[in-house]
């Protein structure tokens, strides 16, 4: 004889509740990475020395390319460098901000002109200068930071350059459009850009460079 449902109610209700809760849980494959875990991973990437090693792994062949390409070349040669996380490091600022970004806080930091050089990339810069290859900096920084940026570059041993190209204060173009147009202008001045360095894909897309070299940047993305 089948027992009445009420005899199973005490067992069935917890099971049904558990099933309901399970069905409401986020699908792991759709959940974004945990923010705390992501911050810890970035910190470990830096503290372990892997970040520096990855930069060095980009800088070493870049130096060799500049030496090779500039050997007995009659052309007007140039290299293009991005600034933030390519030649100057903002780690101190980003760590103090717990990896967050606020425009006003960033502007204050930029005006301190205290970002240290990324040493392997300064070696690349020194190689270009020694081989009389013109250096151009093209940065997403705005015009109002120009003076501080020039001072920062000079203080960090990178004060010899053909031009520092910054974005107009009212610029709304994407990074790709802005930087591509500026590289095009450099080539129109008769230069052959033999290398373009950046930490964002948007620093390098758009052409007008024989070779591109991408530095690691796990901190932020500029589309």
Task: Set out the residue ranges of the language-model regions.
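Non-catalytic pre-domain segments flanking phosphatase-related domains
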Residues: 4-5, 22-81
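Metal-dependent phosphoesterase signature
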Residues: 88-117
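Structured segments of extracytoplasmic/periplasmic soluble domains
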Residues: 61, 65-72, 91-94, 124-134, ...
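Active-site-adjacent structural elements in enzyme catalytic domains
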Residues: 74-95
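Short, acidic loop-to-helix structural element flanking the phosphoryl-transfer center
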Residues: 106-136, 143-144
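Bacterial N-terminal signal peptides
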Residues: 11-22
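Stable alpha-helical elements in mature extracytoplasmic
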Residues: 51-62, 117-124, 145, 149, ...
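C-terminal cap/substrate-recognition subdomain and adjoining C-terminal extension
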Residues: 28-40, 53, 75, 133, ...
């Amino acid at each position: 004889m089948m027992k009445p449902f009420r005899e199973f109610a005490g067992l069935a209700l917890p099971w049904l509740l558990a099933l309901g809760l399970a069905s409401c849980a986020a699908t792991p494959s759709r959940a974004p990475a945990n923010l705390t875990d992501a911050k810890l991973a970035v910190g470990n990437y830096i503290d372990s020395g892997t970040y520096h090693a990855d930069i060095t792994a980009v800088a070493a062949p870049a130096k060799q390319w500049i030496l090779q390409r500039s050997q007995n070349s009659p052309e007007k040669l140039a290299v293009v460098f991005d600034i933030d996380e390519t030649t100057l490091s903002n780690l101190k600022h980003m760590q103090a901000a717990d990896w967050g970004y606020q425009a006003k806080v960033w502007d204050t930091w930029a005006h301190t002109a205290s970002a240290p050089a990324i040493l392997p990339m300064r070696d690349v810069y020194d190689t270009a200068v020694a081989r009389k290859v013109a250096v151009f900096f093209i940065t997403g920084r705005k015009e109002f930071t120009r003076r501080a940026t020039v001072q920062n570059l000079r203080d960090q041993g990178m004060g010899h350059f053909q031009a520092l190209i910054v974005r107009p204060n009212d610029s709304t173009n994407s990074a790709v459009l802005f930087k591509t147009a500026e590289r095009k202008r450099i080539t129109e001045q008769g230069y052959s850009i033999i290398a373009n360095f950046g930490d964002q894909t948007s620093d390098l897309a758009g052409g007008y460079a024989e070779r591109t070299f991408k530095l690691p940047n796990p901190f932020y993305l500029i589309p």
